[in-house]
Amino acid sequence: MHSWQTTRFQIDLSRPRIMGIVNVTPDSFSDGGRHASASAALRHCEQLLREGADVLDIGGESTRPGSPPVPLAEELARVRPVLQGALKLGAPVSIDTCKPEVMAEALEMGVDIINDIWALRRGQAQAVVAAHPRCGVCLMHMHGEPATMQQAPMPGGPGEAVAAVADFLRERSQTLHALGVARERIVIDPGIGFGKTPEQNLALLARQRELLAATGAPLLAGWSRKSTLGLLLADEGQPPPAPGERISASVAAALIAVQRGAALVRVHDVAATAQALKVWAAVQALSGSQS
């Protein structure tokens, strides 16, 4: 599949696309509080687009490990003005939420994509999406729930985790398709860091093509500043570097994901990722003539 059908845009996936993260939260693991006001968040949206983002992913509830749920009214108050402004910027807009009520209001506003860490398993979420004629949807795998997921990650080894994630994403994709959601509207996300050990996360990257083969759907890779990268970077006996100090590792993971077939990468550091992908694309364009 070479495109992603969304509300207002048919996103061309013949080349990797960048989803820029816009956290309208005081407590996100990497940049909580930096863009908590609507004006700051909209300035950040504009900056990400200048840096090369293809999609804006706006969220009003942190999903970091251990994070508590945000009341519905508070989440809506956070994201509503940002969505209103972002929809005027001429780029696809995604709402990162697990609440059906937020999804429904966002879609009424004209939002292009629903990005749900619960893969539409809560309440009337899948009915909200199925009732919409065109919106895109990203289905993510998560073991457990954000408040406790890293206290009891997925059982089994790396290989068992890859198989379980593939089965889950296949089942969710098939369920939505049976409800009338066209395949070209669906993207999958293995959920790096959502109830998984570092070894399981790395296996999902190393064996990413198995997820693509299992579902036939485009894949969104979300490695940006994740704790697994911090553990890999930590010197012996030292704490991992802070999330903002994991940029090079995040770009490396994004490139590996793209090399293994990811259609989109969800990142905080758009400029660095866009530069790296330009180099990758230039080499890819010549690789056929040198084979």
Give residue spans per PLM region:
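Catalytic domains of carbohydrate-active enzymes, especially glycoside hydrolases
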Residues: R43-G59, R260
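SAM-dependent methyltransferases
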Residues: M1-P16
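Active-site-adjacent loop and "lid" segments of alpha/beta metabolic enzymes
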Residues: L13, S30-H44, T63-G85, L89, ...
